[in-house]
Amino acid sequence: MKYFITLCFFIICSLVNGHLYSQIQQAPQRSEGDGPFERLIIRGVTVINSTGAPPIGPVDIVVEKNIIKQIKSVGYPGTPVMDKDRPKAGAGDKVMDCEGMYILPGFVDMHGHIGGQSQGTPAEYVFKLWLGHGITTIRDPASGNGVKWTMEHKAKSLKNEIAAPRILCYPAFGSGWDKPISTPEEARLWVRENAKNGADGIKFFGAAPEIFKAALDENKKLGLKSACHHAQLEVGRMNVMATAAAGLTTMEHWYGLPEALFDGQTLQDYPSDYNYNNEQHRFEEAGRLWKQAAKPGSERWNFVMNELLKMDFTLDPTFNIYDANRDLMRARQADWHKIYTLPSLWKFYAPSRISHGSYWFDWGTEQEIAWKENYKLWMQFVNEYKNKGGRVTAGSDSGFIYQLYGFGYIRELELLREAGFLPLEVIRAATLKGAEALGMVDKIGSIEIGKYADFVLLDENPLANIKVLYGTGTIKLNEKNEAERIGGVKYTIKDGIIYDAKKMLADVKAIVDRAKAENDGELLQPGEKKLKP
């Protein structure tokens, strides 16, 4: 039995953790951003908060160093601002005149991989794409660059020595050991070592039940959080109902949820020629999984939902990372690729039997239709879970499947809207709910006195059109009958430091341009040949 457990754990590590990457180029010392200031006053904004309140403005916000100290309504729309009521600026105070702009809490990406060696993405590139889209906190699930590397960058970000979001480190279960974990005692030992190393939680892919339960129990005793991608290699033994009951705090993607909803079978119905290592098999059949689950509103559907609600369980759906499965051409042709996607990352995305998430061996209409139906059921469960009081967060998992860091996160917000979330509910999922799931609700997630000064500032109203948050903006016809680009985050403020979001993206473009010049890196579509001059 011990041999069998060891073998299963080895297979999980080799097949799933095999997609984790070696260390990438470290982030340089910060030279960008102004602040923090002894006192910063942001004047005249409309606040779009995550507390359930409607927008309100004009408002002045006072920040001292990195803490929000005052939030003051200073007038009414269409009338002059009441100067007598405004916070007074003293000598040396930094004042931002943001009249007419919108301010939101800094975004939380609950599934943010810090690049990868296989993708050729240096840390600076990833961090600036995130900051360019208002992302001020990320959770790095599996911490694929290694615990030491991730913890070093976490510490540097906390000290604002690098231009980067706040980082939470969730190493992959079993990582860092030179042998598989084969007993509950070893599982508990690894969890204690993980906590001692300063990690914020654990990312699981699955394990033998006695090992998985021991690890979750020990992790819970230590007060740490956890996340799980319920890989098909182990989900047949522990789906989300079992792992949540054992102490798991967050599930990633959809894995483990339809399996918990089975009411006429106990396992996924795999074709006889299925091979997990063939990723076209893996993801094509995943697109047919939700229709094998219990129907919406059925006894099993309601039972699973109610049990997860009782456990205060968090869903982190990462809708965007599978979005290409519904429309591959759209994902490949996204506006931002030609400007912001590195040639090495573009090559990684292309059809490959080796690169993870590049399973476009023969992807066509039938696969896309199946996935569109899959999304309808998946989104229905997630939206209903939210409506019944469940916690749903926003995570992107970018760097795979034609999803680019930052841009993929905004796409996730659009997909939450498609699932049925109201615009304000989308913002809450992207901010306050992420803060709750991370155990940081006292510090981030909303614009409230005493919290960190993490903000997103932009000229356009994202409640009217989420697309204005994309770094490439959106298209609008002006009064001269001319198409123009509007939107994009203007400033990202993290820890009271003001980052010019468009400058962040300009730096990313420069990194991409250099890579193209050095490697003749024109981005060609798969199968397309470069034309000879």
Region annotations inferred by a language model:
Residues 24-28, 32-38, 47, 53-104:
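Histidine-rich, glycine-flanked metal-binding segment
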Residues 172-222, 249-250, 261, 277-295:
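Active-site gating/metal-coordination segments in enzymes
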Residues 45, 360-370, 375, 380, ...:
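C-terminal helical cap
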Residues 190-200, 257-414, 418-419, 515, ...:
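Active-site neighborhoods of metal-dependent hydrolases
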Residues 6-19:
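Bacterial N-terminal signal peptides
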Residues 85-161, 179-185, 238-244, 265:
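Metal-associated gating/positioning segment near the N- to mid-region
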Residues 452-507:
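C-terminal cap of metal-dependent C-N hydrolases
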Residues 126-147, 164-174, 195-207, 216, ...:
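Divalent metal-dependent hydrolysis catalytic cores, especially in the metallo-beta-lactamase
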